[in-house]
A protein has these predicted regions:
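Short, glycine-biased loop/turn motifs at secondary-structure junctions and
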Residues: 1-170
């Protein structure tokens, strides 16, 4: 199964700080761990969940062995980094800006009591794509008053990423 994983620029994972064997001309070495969601196993995501995990460096990841689907992620017994998605390096700032612009757009159409969200957007840009995607989705949820608006905004963001990064359709 092909999935995706965001890592720090040095190849270490954000939550566990595990340093991955990086791919060069060939995929990196296999890594193994028992599967236990949020505790152990190789955590990755499908393209539809990229906005939830946006980070500095994106890798296409080959999963193997036992694979468990969980909310917003997949957990595998084995994985290796197949390749770095270089298009993310080129599109990360554009994605952040798109999310900021979308947040502004949503606030412009929102009831006056949600106007305070607009002041959050620009100061959040240096924090990067994960925060801006979340802010836009939260504004959508506040406007509609229901969680499916949040998920619809996240799905819109995922479609943008799939298209711009040249990933297989979801």
């Amino acid at each position: 199964m092909i999935a995706y994983k965001f890592l720090r620029p040095d190849g270490s994972s954000v939550f566990a700080s595990f340093r991955w064997p990086l791919p060069e001309a060939e995929p990196g070495d296999w890594v193994e761990a028992p599967v236990e969601p949020c505790r152990s196993g190789i955590h990755a995501c499908r393209a539809s969940h990229l906005p939830h995990w946006a980070g500095r460096a994106l890798y296409e990841t080959e999963l193997g062995g036992r694979i468990v689907e969980d909310a917003g992620k997949v957990i595998a017994e084995r994985a290796r980094l197949a390749r770095r998605v270089r298009a993310w390096d080129e599109q990360r700032d554009a994605y952040t800006r798109m999310c900021a612009d979308r947040a502004h757009e949503l606030v412009r159409g929102a009831p006056p009591e949600l106007a305070h969200w607009d002041s959050v957007v620009e100061p959040s840009i240096p924090e990067g794509p994960a925060l801006l995607g979340f802010v836009a989705a939260r504004i959508a949820e506040e406007i509609e008053g229901r969680a499916d608006a949040y998920h619809a905004e996240r799905a819109r963001q995922a479609r943008w990423l799939v298209e711009r990064l040249g990933l297989p359709a979801m």
